[in-house]
């Protein structure tokens, strides 16, 4: 049977459906172990979560695992040093999967600094973390997704990207101008072109509008007596 848990605050916020793909009873002796695969799906209501769970059950955990391993193998970076290779690829995949996600309701791409509830701005957007720290790994992992992430910087996050932290919808969470965050998407664009040799991104109107926006904001923070920008 498929079990469903709904989280509500007025209307349903989300639903989690879970199941396992085994039926037999398992008895374990001391020091024995057995792996059980549980299928967990999430939706904005019980029907959606349950139907996704049923679909994954039909495909089976073995097939799903094989498909995911294939994705990881295609992304794998070959490094001669075995211990270094393990570390690099572990960090590459962690950076990719934990810094990016999609919204449940609209399936829009969102970028975030942390998913941990222990972090004081969990699931918030920081331009520094996304475009200066995580971005090179995202380019290595998925070039198409990296370009999509740049487009977010040219649109959703453009107006407020210089502020300390934003909600994932682009509104200001923590005020405070930070110079490196203002120019972070431009630095990321340069890195993208350097790594992919795809300079067509410079021709899209949103990029040109972003450059104009950044130059306009810079003027407000320039101190002519020092020749420096405040931050």
Please identify what each model-predicted range represents.
Residues 19, 166-170, 231:
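Conserved alpha/beta core surface patches that mediate binding of polyanionic ligands
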Residues 98, 102-104, 220-230:
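C-terminal ends of transmembrane alpha-helices
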Residues 1-124, 200-201:
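Acidic/polar, glycine-enriched structural segments that form the non-catalytic walls/loops
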Residues 34, 57-60, 64, 121-226:
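Aromatic-rich carbohydrate-recognition surfaces in CAZymes
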